Protein backbone atom coordinates (compact mmCIF):
# COMPACT_ATOMS: atom_id res chain seq x y z
CA UNK A 1 0.00 0.00 0.00
CA UNK A 2 1.67 3.27 -1.08
CA UNK A 3 1.70 6.33 1.18
CA UNK A 4 0.72 9.67 -0.37
CA UNK A 5 0.75 13.16 1.12
CA UNK A 6 -2.67 14.73 1.75
CA UNK A 7 -2.83 18.28 0.46
CA UNK A 8 -4.43 21.48 1.70
CA UNK A 9 -6.51 21.65 -1.49
CA UNK A 10 -7.88 18.17 -0.86
CA UNK A 11 -8.77 19.15 2.71
CA UNK A 12 -10.55 22.29 1.51
CA UNK A 13 -12.59 20.24 -0.95
CA UNK A 14 -13.96 18.16 1.93
CA UNK A 15 -15.31 21.10 3.94
CA UNK A 16 -19.10 20.89 4.24
CA UNK A 17 -21.03 23.67 2.54
CA UNK A 18 -22.79 26.48 4.36
CA UNK A 19 -26.22 26.93 2.72
CA UNK A 20 -28.25 30.02 3.53
CA UNK A 21 -30.95 27.94 5.25
CA UNK A 22 -28.48 26.17 7.54
CA UNK A 23 -29.53 25.71 11.18
CA UNK A 24 -28.22 23.76 14.15
CA UNK A 25 -30.33 20.72 13.33
CA UNK A 26 -28.67 20.15 9.96
CA UNK A 27 -25.11 20.93 11.08
CA UNK A 28 -24.65 17.52 12.67
CA UNK A 29 -25.74 16.17 16.04
CA UNK A 30 -22.91 14.46 17.90
CA UNK A 31 -22.83 12.35 21.06
CA UNK A 32 -19.68 12.25 23.22
CA UNK A 33 -19.45 9.33 25.66
CA UNK A 34 -16.65 9.58 28.18
CA UNK A 35 -15.28 11.10 31.34
CA UNK A 36 -14.44 9.71 34.75
CA UNK A 37 -13.51 10.98 38.19
CA UNK A 38 -9.86 11.03 37.13
CA UNK A 39 -10.39 12.58 33.69
CA UNK A 40 -13.47 14.81 33.84
CA UNK A 41 -12.07 17.32 31.35
CA UNK A 42 -11.40 14.98 28.43
CA UNK A 43 -14.97 14.77 27.10
CA UNK A 44 -15.33 18.53 27.55
CA UNK A 45 -12.36 19.05 25.23
CA UNK A 46 -13.93 16.73 22.65
CA UNK A 47 -17.25 18.56 22.93
CA UNK A 48 -15.56 21.96 22.64
CA UNK A 49 -13.65 20.84 19.56
CA UNK A 50 -16.82 19.53 17.94
CA UNK A 51 -18.56 22.86 18.50
CA UNK A 52 -15.55 24.79 17.19
CA UNK A 53 -15.60 22.53 14.11
CA UNK A 54 -19.18 23.55 13.37
CA UNK A 55 -21.28 20.80 14.92
CA UNK A 56 -24.83 22.00 15.47
CA UNK A 57 -25.64 20.03 18.62
CA UNK A 58 -23.25 18.20 20.94
CA UNK A 59 -24.55 15.95 23.72
CA UNK A 60 -22.35 14.56 26.49
CA UNK A 61 -23.13 11.28 28.24
CA UNK A 62 -21.21 10.85 31.48
CA UNK A 63 -21.64 10.66 35.23
CA UNK A 64 -23.63 13.40 36.93
CA UNK A 65 -20.42 14.68 38.56
CA UNK A 66 -18.61 14.97 35.23
CA UNK A 67 -21.63 16.55 33.54
CA UNK A 68 -21.89 19.17 36.28
CA UNK A 69 -18.19 19.99 36.02
CA UNK A 70 -18.33 20.27 32.24
CA UNK A 71 -21.50 22.36 32.29
CA UNK A 72 -19.67 25.05 34.22
CA UNK A 73 -17.20 25.29 31.33
CA UNK A 74 -19.46 24.56 28.36
CA UNK A 75 -23.06 25.71 28.72
CA UNK A 76 -23.60 25.14 24.98
CA UNK A 77 -23.57 21.34 25.39
CA UNK A 78 -26.61 19.11 26.04
CA UNK A 79 -25.89 16.97 29.12
CA UNK A 80 -27.08 13.41 29.67
CA UNK A 81 -26.19 12.49 33.26
CA UNK A 82 -25.68 8.77 33.84
CA UNK A 83 -28.95 7.08 34.69
CA UNK A 84 -27.27 3.80 35.57
CA UNK A 85 -27.08 2.30 32.08
CA UNK A 86 -24.90 4.25 29.66
CA UNK A 87 -25.53 1.90 26.76
CA UNK A 88 -29.29 2.16 27.09
CA UNK A 89 -29.14 5.95 27.37
CA UNK A 90 -26.95 6.21 24.26
CA UNK A 91 -29.19 3.92 22.22
CA UNK A 92 -32.32 5.78 23.35
CA UNK A 93 -30.75 9.03 22.11
CA UNK A 94 -29.50 7.51 18.84
CA UNK A 95 -32.54 8.43 16.68
CA UNK A 96 -31.89 12.15 17.23
CA UNK A 97 -28.11 11.93 16.75
CA UNK A 98 -25.86 11.44 13.73
CA UNK A 99 -22.61 10.07 15.18
CA UNK A 100 -20.78 9.34 18.42
CA UNK A 101 -17.32 9.77 19.93
CA UNK A 102 -16.64 7.13 22.57
CA UNK A 103 -13.74 6.91 24.98
CA UNK A 104 -12.26 10.31 25.94
CA UNK A 105 -11.33 10.15 29.62
CA UNK A 106 -13.56 7.11 30.12
CA UNK A 107 -11.21 5.19 32.41
CA UNK A 108 -10.74 1.45 32.58
CA UNK A 109 -13.36 0.35 35.06
CA UNK A 110 -14.98 -2.88 33.92
CA UNK A 111 -18.40 -1.30 33.43
CA UNK A 112 -16.93 1.50 31.31
CA UNK A 113 -15.09 -0.93 29.05
CA UNK A 114 -18.31 -2.92 28.68
CA UNK A 115 -20.11 0.20 27.41
CA UNK A 116 -17.55 0.63 24.64
CA UNK A 117 -17.84 -2.98 23.52
CA UNK A 118 -21.63 -2.82 23.59
CA UNK A 119 -21.72 0.38 21.53
CA UNK A 120 -19.24 -1.02 19.01
CA UNK A 121 -21.76 -3.74 18.25
CA UNK A 122 -25.06 -1.92 18.80
CA UNK A 123 -24.59 1.80 18.02
CA UNK A 124 -26.41 2.32 14.69
CA UNK A 125 -24.60 5.45 13.49
CA UNK A 126 -20.99 6.36 12.59
CA UNK A 127 -18.64 5.98 15.52
CA UNK A 128 -15.19 7.21 16.58
CA UNK A 129 -13.30 5.38 19.32
CA UNK A 130 -10.37 6.95 21.15
CA UNK A 131 -8.51 6.85 24.45
CA UNK A 132 -9.63 4.19 26.88
CA UNK A 133 -12.22 3.13 24.33
CA UNK A 134 -9.34 1.66 22.34
CA UNK A 135 -8.22 -0.30 25.39
CA UNK A 136 -11.73 -1.75 25.55
CA UNK A 137 -11.68 -2.75 21.89
CA UNK A 138 -8.51 -4.77 22.39
CA UNK A 139 -10.79 -7.29 24.12
CA UNK A 140 -13.37 -7.50 21.33
CA UNK A 141 -13.82 -10.83 19.57
CA UNK A 142 -12.04 -11.01 16.22
CA UNK A 143 -15.24 -11.45 14.23
CA UNK A 144 -16.69 -8.27 15.77
CA UNK A 145 -13.74 -6.21 14.53
CA UNK A 146 -14.95 -6.48 10.95
CA UNK A 147 -18.59 -5.66 11.72
CA UNK A 148 -18.42 -1.92 11.01
CA UNK A 149 -17.57 0.12 7.95
CA UNK A 150 -18.41 3.51 9.44
CA UNK A 151 -15.97 3.70 12.35
CA UNK A 152 -12.77 5.66 12.95
CA UNK A 153 -10.11 4.58 15.44
CA UNK A 154 -7.46 7.12 16.49
CA UNK A 155 -4.66 5.24 18.29
CA UNK A 156 -1.17 6.38 19.15
CA UNK A 157 1.64 3.86 18.71
CA UNK A 158 1.13 2.19 22.09
CA UNK A 159 -2.61 1.77 21.55
CA UNK A 160 -2.00 0.49 18.03
CA UNK A 161 0.45 -2.07 19.40
CA UNK A 162 -2.11 -3.33 21.89
CA UNK A 163 -4.79 -3.66 19.22
CA UNK A 164 -2.41 -5.62 16.99
CA UNK A 165 -0.84 -7.70 19.75
CA UNK A 166 2.69 -6.53 18.89
CA UNK A 167 5.29 -4.28 20.50
CA UNK A 168 5.31 -0.50 20.28
CA UNK A 169 8.74 -0.75 18.66
CA UNK A 170 7.26 -2.91 15.90
CA UNK A 171 4.63 -0.25 15.20
CA UNK A 172 7.21 2.53 15.31
CA UNK A 173 9.52 0.71 12.90
CA UNK A 174 6.78 0.23 10.27
CA UNK A 175 3.96 2.67 10.90
CA UNK A 176 2.46 2.22 7.45
CA UNK A 177 2.15 -1.53 7.85
CA UNK A 178 0.60 -1.10 11.29
CA UNK A 179 -1.95 1.41 9.98
CA UNK A 180 -2.81 -0.84 7.05
CA UNK A 181 -3.34 -3.89 9.28
CA UNK A 182 -5.49 -1.93 11.71
CA UNK A 183 -7.59 -0.51 8.88
CA UNK A 184 -8.29 -3.91 7.36
CA UNK A 185 -9.48 -5.10 10.75
CA UNK A 186 -11.37 -2.07 12.07
CA UNK A 187 -12.39 0.03 9.05
CA UNK A 188 -10.65 3.42 9.17
CA UNK A 189 -7.63 4.20 11.33
CA UNK A 190 -5.79 7.42 12.06
CA UNK A 191 -2.40 6.49 13.50
CA UNK A 192 -1.20 9.48 15.50
CA UNK A 193 2.40 10.59 15.28
CA UNK A 194 4.75 12.47 13.02
CA UNK A 195 3.63 11.94 10.38
CA UNK A 196 0.01 11.05 11.03
CA UNK A 197 -1.20 8.24 8.78
CA UNK A 198 -4.82 7.64 7.74
CA UNK A 199 -5.66 4.26 6.22
CA UNK A 200 -8.95 2.55 5.49
CA UNK A 201 -10.23 -0.90 4.63
CA UNK A 202 -9.96 -1.66 0.93
CA UNK A 203 -7.99 1.50 0.19
CA UNK A 204 -5.41 1.44 -2.57
CA UNK A 205 -3.24 3.91 -0.66
CA UNK A 206 -2.83 5.50 2.76
CA UNK A 207 -2.48 9.23 3.32
CA UNK A 208 0.23 11.09 5.21
CA UNK A 209 -0.38 14.34 7.09
CA UNK A 210 2.72 16.19 8.26
CA UNK A 211 1.29 19.56 9.34
CA UNK A 212 1.35 18.92 13.07
CA UNK A 213 4.25 20.00 15.27
CA UNK A 214 5.32 19.70 18.90
CA UNK A 215 2.60 22.13 19.95
CA UNK A 216 0.12 19.27 19.47
CA UNK A 217 1.98 16.99 21.89
CA UNK A 218 0.08 18.17 24.95
CA UNK A 219 -2.46 16.52 27.28
CA UNK A 220 -5.93 16.61 25.78
CA UNK A 221 -4.81 17.22 22.20
CA UNK A 222 -6.10 13.79 21.18
CA UNK A 223 -9.48 14.57 22.74
CA UNK A 224 -9.63 17.71 20.60
CA UNK A 225 -8.80 15.68 17.50
CA UNK A 226 -11.55 13.18 18.31
CA UNK A 227 -14.16 15.90 18.71
CA UNK A 228 -13.14 17.55 15.46
CA UNK A 229 -13.37 14.30 13.48
CA UNK A 230 -16.61 13.41 15.26
CA UNK A 231 -18.16 16.69 14.15
CA UNK A 232 -17.52 15.84 10.51
CA UNK A 233 -18.84 12.31 10.95
CA UNK A 234 -22.03 13.89 12.32
CA UNK A 235 -22.20 16.19 9.28
CA UNK A 236 -22.31 13.16 7.02
CA UNK A 237 -18.72 12.79 5.83
CA UNK A 238 -17.49 9.25 5.27
CA UNK A 239 -15.16 7.89 7.94
CA UNK A 240 -12.09 8.33 5.74
CA UNK A 241 -12.95 11.90 4.77
CA UNK A 242 -13.85 12.91 8.32
CA UNK A 243 -10.52 11.58 9.58
CA UNK A 244 -8.54 13.34 6.85
CA UNK A 245 -10.32 16.67 7.26
CA UNK A 246 -10.26 16.53 11.05
CA UNK A 247 -6.56 15.72 11.18
CA UNK A 248 -5.83 18.49 8.68
CA UNK A 249 -7.65 21.12 10.73
CA UNK A 250 -6.10 19.86 13.95
CA UNK A 251 -2.65 20.34 12.44
CA UNK A 252 -3.55 23.75 11.05
CA UNK A 253 -4.93 24.85 14.41
CA UNK A 254 -1.67 23.88 16.04
CA UNK A 255 0.31 25.75 13.41
CA UNK A 256 -1.63 28.92 14.20
CA UNK A 257 -0.39 28.72 17.79
CA UNK A 258 3.23 28.01 16.86
CA UNK A 259 4.39 31.65 16.50
CA UNK A 260 3.74 32.15 20.21
CA UNK A 261 6.04 29.25 21.07
CA UNK A 262 5.38 25.55 21.40
CA UNK A 263 5.79 25.45 25.19
CA UNK A 264 2.75 25.92 27.37
CA UNK A 265 0.12 25.35 24.66
CA UNK A 266 -3.19 24.13 26.10
CA UNK A 267 -5.50 21.66 24.40
CA UNK A 268 -8.36 24.12 24.80
CA UNK A 269 -6.32 26.65 22.82
CA UNK A 270 -5.98 24.12 20.01
CA UNK A 271 -9.75 23.64 20.07
CA UNK A 272 -10.36 27.38 19.95
CA UNK A 273 -7.97 27.68 16.99
CA UNK A 274 -10.04 25.24 14.93
CA UNK A 275 -12.54 27.93 13.95
CA UNK A 276 -10.02 30.36 12.39
CA UNK A 277 -8.17 27.41 10.86
CA UNK A 278 -11.36 26.34 9.13
CA UNK A 279 -12.05 29.85 7.88
CA UNK A 280 -8.52 30.07 6.52
CA UNK A 281 -8.99 26.74 4.75
CA UNK A 282 -12.14 28.08 3.08
CA UNK A 283 -10.33 31.14 1.72
Language-model segments: residues:
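Small-residue (G/A/S/T)-rich helix-start motifs and N-terminal tracts that mark the onset
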Residues: 1-126, 135-152, 157-283
Amino acid sequence: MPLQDFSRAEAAALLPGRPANMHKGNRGRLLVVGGSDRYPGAPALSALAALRSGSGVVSLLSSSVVCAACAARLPEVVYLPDGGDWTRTALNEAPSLAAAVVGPGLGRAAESLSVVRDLWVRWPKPLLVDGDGLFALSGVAVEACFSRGDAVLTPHEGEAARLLGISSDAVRNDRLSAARRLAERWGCVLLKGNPTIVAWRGGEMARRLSWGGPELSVPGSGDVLSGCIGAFLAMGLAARDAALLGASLHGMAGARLRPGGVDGVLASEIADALRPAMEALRS
